[in-house]
Amino acid sequence: MLSGLWSSILALLGVFLQSVGEFRAETQEQDVEIVQKYLKNYYNSDKRNSGLVVEILKQFFGLKVTGKPDAETLVMKQSTCGVPDVGEYVLTPGNPRWENTHLTYRIENYTPDLVSPLTFTKVSEGQADIMISFVRGDHRDKYPFDGPGGNLAHASQPGPGIGGDAHFDEYERWTKNFQDYNLYRVAAHELGHSLGLSHSTDIGALMYPTYLRGDVQLSQDDIDGPSGNPVQPRGPQTPQVCDSKLTFDAITTVRGELMFFKMRTNRFYPEVELGLQAAYEMADRDEVRFFKGNKYWAVSGQDVLYGYPKDIHSSFGFPTGVAHECWSYDEYKQSMDTGYADEFPGDAVFQKFFHGTRQYQFDLKTKRILTLQKANSWFNCRKN
């Protein structure tokens, strides 16, 4: 059952939304510049202590701590919430909370991106507890917006003055679907701040600071946080990479990066079903294809291409029962290879096959299994 505070958030969010309708860096120098700009914008940090702050940030985001900018640290490039990840936002005794239980709000203006506003009850003039507005650049709260992408919105913790106010960057294109930025999802997150919630370190939580596509779903961390009682941070609820029982749903390269998929893939690809079984990249088309059962999806970036999912039988010519057989499909000829078992294609030295917690290294020339390893050996785990 949802806590009372989350019920308040969802109720306030519903009224608000009715009123408005529904690469990674190429050089190390660019990486450093991105990190320094991020720290300056959100943490008032100079170059002298930036290494320490990077370590703290990476611990918060669940990344490997090195104190140096790297590909993992570049999560900073993603669109994000503008509230700094500092301790005073945690719901613990002594931190600000609304003293009264009946809160008023007022929407100062509307974004023209979403049409057909509906009738709702609001404070039409004067000062409300929660003032909601769409603004650009410097809007006199010491946290100017930075244009399209980057800082999407921010909200103040409960208190007098601007306390509880939520500001949305009008330079963004707000939508009611998953093109650009979904207003419902961002508003739900920001109104959580307006009611006193902190950021969560659980990547599956609504209160995780980085914007992720997908339907609004409350994680256990979201539900536990607003209970009103001091709670210890739950931390990321992601699988432990060195767990000896760890398995993967799918593995493939994506734009030069090796990607391991496990559960929650709809956080990045909201139109792709959970429970993937296989994936591969077509780099020359900038597409990744995901397979589940007899269906597959073609994805570019985070968007599923038009007309997908499709059926593997009609598209590739798979028989109705594949079972334990191995097949090769020629993307250029758009047909299955013939004589596949005798003429294994490819020019790699070997290929790896994953099944459960194991990975098999297959030699293309001898057509034999060379080694058997744990599937998570890619993560420098000790033997377990």
UniProtKB/Swiss-Prot annotation:
Hemopexin repeats lie at residues 273-319, 333-381. GO terms for molecular function: metalloendopeptidase activity; zinc ion binding. Residues 26-88 form a propeptide. Ca(2+) 3 binds at residues 146-147, 149, 151, 169, 172. It is found in: Secreted, Extracellular space, Extracellular matrix. Can be activated without removal of the activation peptide. This is Interstitial collagenase. It comes from Aquarana catesbeiana (American bullfrog).
